[in-house]
Amino acid sequence: MARMKHTARMSTGGKAPRKQLASKALRKAPPPPTKGVKQPTTTTSGKWRFARFHRKLPFQGLVRKIWQDLKTHLRFKNHSVPPLEEVTEVYPCQTIGGCY
C-alpha cells in the first residue's frame, strides 16, 4: 500500500455555538384550543378508493362462488368483474322492462 500523507488540519477551537432553545420550544408548543364544535373530517381520495373497492367485493364473491360450482381453479382479473356486474344489472332490467 502506498503511504498517505497527513495534512495539517486547523483546529476549530472547540464546539460550534448552538442555536437558541427558545425558538425550538415555541415550534413544539401545542396549537391553541378551538372554540365550538369540531368539524368532521372529509374523506380523502384513498378512503374513497377503498369504499369503491369494498362495494365490489360482495358481487365478486358471488361470481367466484358460481364459477367454483362450474369449474375449479379459476382466477379473475380485477378489470374482468365490473363488465360482468354491468351485464348482470342490465339483463333483468331489460327483461322486466319489456313485460308491460
From Swiss-Prot:
Designated name of the protein: Histone H3-like 2
Region (Disordered) residue spans: 1-46
Annotated family: Belongs to the histone H3 family.
Cited InterPro entries: Histone-fold, Histone_H3/CENP-A
Known role: Core component of nucleosome. Nucleosomes wrap and compact DNA into chromatin, limiting DNA accessibility to the cellular machineries which require DNA as a template. Histones thereby play a central role in transcription regulation, DNA repair, DNA replication and chromosomal stability. DNA accessibility is regulated via a complex set of post-translational modifications of histones, also called histone code, and nucleosome remodeling.
Cystine crosslinks: none
Tissue expr: Pollen specific.
Keywords: Chromosome, DNA-binding, Nucleosome core, Nucleus
Top-level taxon of the source organism: Eukaryota
Provenance organism: Lilium longiflorum (Trumpet lily)
